[in-house]
């Protein structure tokens, strides 16, 4: 009679096929849990607390890991998804993160339908921060990689909450891939590509107008005790701005007593003398120093100076004085070499000297 079912399980009867878990619970926020079992960090995740009896039913129904659930609020018709953190809630109750209560639009004590489900592994998610304060995070992708470990699923249009440096940030799920009828993905043990939309309230600045305003402020700040950038005014180095060549040339002409213009007998105009380069100009300090008129807000730190070279004699003397440990070595052992003629005493030296002649007046 039941031979048509012999194909299940290889002809040995029925097998334990996964079945659907579906129950109704009274939902409450995590803040209303008993102090002994409450975990405030669970508010910044996507997992719920179920009673121990739910674990027994899930085991009997052969629900596969990871255990994912579809949460439906019949009062509002809203749906979201999540995982389970622990089975420590009171019988008939389920505890949800605060953001999940707001997403479903339900109040504490509302009736919530919870059923097991399967969603595809996530590959891509696009997020929209709900505040410009999110831009203060230096490395948002690294932060999300850490906080998303507290989530099992991400559902489109959900506004999740994360905590970073003592601040709470709200993030809306705009898009997920792969797409499915549940509009949700599983983020457990998967590589997830993350993209960000501009935060709510963020306005892209006009960089061209901002740069023009900064240049205008720099030009207007000239002469007001503020730092001046010569490149803004189109000026070059300090020597160019103070006309160092003209000042040095005028000072040199004052030292010349016979300054004038020569005339040729032939009537031809005299050849103009080539301009002398500033580097080749010889600077003397005998005359009166030239007046240095500087614009307001500029400083002058002196003319270029080349130190004189040391004389060769002084250099040689310094080198000789630097040579230390000069002397002659002496051997303590007598030499066995034969004496040369120069080593022997001459016979003249041994001969008696003649008496000196003394003259007596």
From Swiss-Prot:
The chain's disulfide connectivity reads: none
Q: Which InterPro entries match?
A: Ufd1-like (IPR004854), Ufd1-like_Nn (IPR042299), UFD1_N1 (IPR055417), UFD1_N2 (IPR055418)
Q: Where is this region: Disordered?
A: 310-361
Protein name in the entry:
Ubiquitin fusion degradation protein 1
Q: Name one GO molecular function term.
A: polyubiquitin modification-dependent protein binding
Q: Where is this region: Monoubiquitin-binding?
A: 27-28, 30-32, 99-101
- What family does the database annotate? Belongs to the UFD1 family.
């Amino acid at each position: 009679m039941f031979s048509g079912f012999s194909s299940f399980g290889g002809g040995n009867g029925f097998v334990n096929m996964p079945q659907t878990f579906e129950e109704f619970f009274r939902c409450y926020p995590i803040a209303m849990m008993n102090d002994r079992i409450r975990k405030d960090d669970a508010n910044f995740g996507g997992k719920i607390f179920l009673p121990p009896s739910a674990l027994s039913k899930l085991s009997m129904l052969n629900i596969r890991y990871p255990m994912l659930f579809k949460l439906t609020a019949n009062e509002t018709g809203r749906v979201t998804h999540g995982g389970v953190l622990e089975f420590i809630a009171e019988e008939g109750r389920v505890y949800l993160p605060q953001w999940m209560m707001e997403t479903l639009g339900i109040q504490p004590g509302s009736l919530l339908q919870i059923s097991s489900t399967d969603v595809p592994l996530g590959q891509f998610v696009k997020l929209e921060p709900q505040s410009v304060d999110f831009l203060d995070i230096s490395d948002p992708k690294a932060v999300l990689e850490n906080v998303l470990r507290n989530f099992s699923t991400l559902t489109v249009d959900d506004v999740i909450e994360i905590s970073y440096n003592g601040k709470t940030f709200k993030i809306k799920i705009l898009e997920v891939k792969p797409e499915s009828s549940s509009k949700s993905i599983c983020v457990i043990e998967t590589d997830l590509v993350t993209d960000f939309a501009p935060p709510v309230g963020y306005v892209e600045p006009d960089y061209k107008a901002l740069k023009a305003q900064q240049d205008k402020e720099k030009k207007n700040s000239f002469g007001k005790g503020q730092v001046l950038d010569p490149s803004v005014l189109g000026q070059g180095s300090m020597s160019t701005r103070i006309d160092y060549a003209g000042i040095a040339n005028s000072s040199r002409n004052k030292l010349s007593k016979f300054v004038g213009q020569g005339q040729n007998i032939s009537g031809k105009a005299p050849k103009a003398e080539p301009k002398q380069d500033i580097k080749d100009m010889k600077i003397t300090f005998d005359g009166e120093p030239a007046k240095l008129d500087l614009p307001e807000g500029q400083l002058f730190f002196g003319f270029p100076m080349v130190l004189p070279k040391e004389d060769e004699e002084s250099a040689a003397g310094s080198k000789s004085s630097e040579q230390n440990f000069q002397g002659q070595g002496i051997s303590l052992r007598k030499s066995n070499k034969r004496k040369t003629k120069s080593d022997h005493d001459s016979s003249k030296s041994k001969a008696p000297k003649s008496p000196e002649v003394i003259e007596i007046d």
